[in-house]
Amino acid sequence: MGNDISKMRNIGISAHIDSGKTTLSERILFYCDRIHALHEVRGKDGVGATMDNMELEKERGITIQSASTQVKWKDYTVNVIDTPGHVDFTIEVERSLRVLDGAILVLCSVGGVQSQSITVDRQLKRYHVPRIAFVNKCDRTGANPFKVRMQLREKLGLNAYMMQIPIGLEDKLEGVVDLVTMKAMYFEGENGTQIRMAEIPQHLLADAQKYREEMIDAATMFSDELAEAFLEGAETEEMIRAAVRKGTLAEQFVPVFLGSAYKNKGIQPLLDAVGYYLPDPTEIENTALDLDENEKPVVLGTDENAPVVALGFKLEDGKYGQLTYVRVYQGTLKKGEELFNTRAKKKFKVGRLVRMNSATMEDINEGGPGDIVALFGIDCASGDTFCGENLNYAMSSMYVPDPVISLSLTPKDKQAADQMSKALNRFTKEDPTFRSYVDKESNQTIIQGMGELHLEVYIERMKREYKCDVETGMPQVAYREAITQRADFNYTHKKQTGGSGQFGRVAGFIEPCTEQDYEFDNQIKGGAIPSEFIPSCDKGFKEAIKRGTLIGFPIVGTKVTINDGQSHPVDSSDMAFQAAAIGAFREAYKAAKPAILEPIMKVSIEGPQEFQGNIFGLINQRRGIIISSTEDDNFTRVDAEVPLSEMFGFSTILRSSTQGKAEYSMEFAKYGKAPASISEELIKEYEAKRLAEKK
């Protein structure tokens, strides 16, 4: 391969919106010699930053889709994955985090740790991504990197230590003092490309000494050698770096760097830090799930000769067709080789293999462990795993939660209708939690997803990317129906229409079952129903549970047992027994006391402690049950279970009740029985709708 894997870094730049993330990516590309002119995100020259290559991102100066770019810095190869900063795009962020080995957490030296920094940090913790922090915008009025360091400790609970201190702040920012080498660094020349090393200015010496001792003292936790040397005043730069690296990889130490990407100060030492302190692909344990062994976890190696395991983490519609970004975990992915998509259970051939540098690409022949490459023209979905010979692994669980909310879409005109189907086709491939279908009865297009916000993002993207104007209906909750007791049936289906008629009788009972949505048990003895018609009965029952009679939603948790029946030598047929089963089920269903089930969501709300009372109030007003509430450092986190139907418009209400300082996340937990008052209302609405349709 020629690439030394220990010199390879896969990093993401994670941040709150507007903390200067894209500008930092741009500078990294510049100093690593990837682009020859610098562009600002909202530049005067009308050329947006290189990493933001989706039109909408350029226009709004935010980053939505993660582009990946490979750069060389000294003897390191660095893949920079630009992650979205908006909370609404968290599926993108989480996907990017799967493929990162380390991250740079960017913070604004004025704004500090903001609500979204908390979300991003929580995701980094969940995926165990070691990080270094960069306090950006130190040239701005009100800049205070020391305050930001304290917030990293207090709000995020990170063991953060300064690796540098600033030489001047705001418009007097000249450079930084490196606390490892105890030298001052000034960034000079056009675009700050020349670094001048000098002695530390006299007035900063005491501060430098203080912060250096703090940092080394913390690093001695990870190195006995450093602890001994420090006591004797004999510590070396190598010892300090080795200890800080060890702490960072264990996620127990966060080195803090600072500068101003816009003013080209502090970027080169940050790039050095990526090499010094962030992990190479061999230092991170990646696990796959063995689908042949009931999703048993398997630890992947980084052997280039092992069978290939790779993850397609990002799809893009380019001018040359679908582009799939892939992270190789083990083995070598070669052009022309055959791979197996474990979700689609399909083999495919690797045609063109490229390496992306933001929007330009170079053709390559192979990619080894730790590499990030892109494939052309492969039909796959985001999150698919590609394996080499005889492996059936998935990088993430095949479990995709069922959507809990749906919305009808009506295109404004014929052109919008064409664009809408293109957009939906692409979005459903990109995001496994987003689905769409056409409702047979109303002939409307329905989209489904994990929450209100989730669907809003896609409607917005349709307008922008596909110039497609749609009208949206009211959000609909995915209810279910279920029986609550056993009921018997004995039903005869008889139809005489000249020629051969239809005849079939089925008898048995239905009862609730908790293990699965539907179970069929055949207890027929002595051929009361001929064996060739048993599957017809099963088919009929399956058809019957698709729509309940209370409010027309699917029926879950039902076991059907048949134990008797009757057939006719001429008039019995597949269709006759299907019809008999449907009739039998409907007859028993009314007697089995059916109930309506509603989706219950697990809601987590985080916000300042002073709003805890308001948060409890909001949950109680929504028929919610508080499961736990924890406090740490002026912050409160409340976990609750709340019916989805009560959560519409919640983000706006939460913002106004907490001065915009709280945020929430929500995921599907379970189905629960709807209270009688709610059920009665739903049944009334359904009956009124049916009456209106008949007219």
UniProtKB/Swiss-Prot annotation:
Keywords annotated in UniProt: Cytoplasm, Elongation factor, GTP-binding, Nucleotide-binding, Protein biosynthesis
A GO term for molecular function: translation elongation factor activity
A GO cellular-component term linked to this record: cytoplasm
Annotated compartments: Cytoplasm
Domain tr-type G: 6-282
Family the entry assigns: Belongs to the TRAFAC class translation factor GTPase superfamily. Classic translation factor GTPase family. EF-G/EF-2 subfamily.
Purpose of the protein: Catalyzes the GTP-dependent ribosomal translocation step during translation elongation. During this step, the ribosome changes from the pre-translocational (PRE) to the post-translocational (POST) state as the newly formed A-site-bound peptidyl-tRNA and P-site-bound deacylated tRNA move to the P and E sites, respectively. Catalyzes the coordinated movement of the two tRNA molecules, the mRNA and conformational changes in the ribosome.
Name by which UniProt lists this protein: Elongation factor G 2
Organism: Treponema denticola (strain ATCC 35405 / DSM 14222 / CIP 103919 / JCM 8153 / KCTC 15104)
Gene that encodes it: fusA2
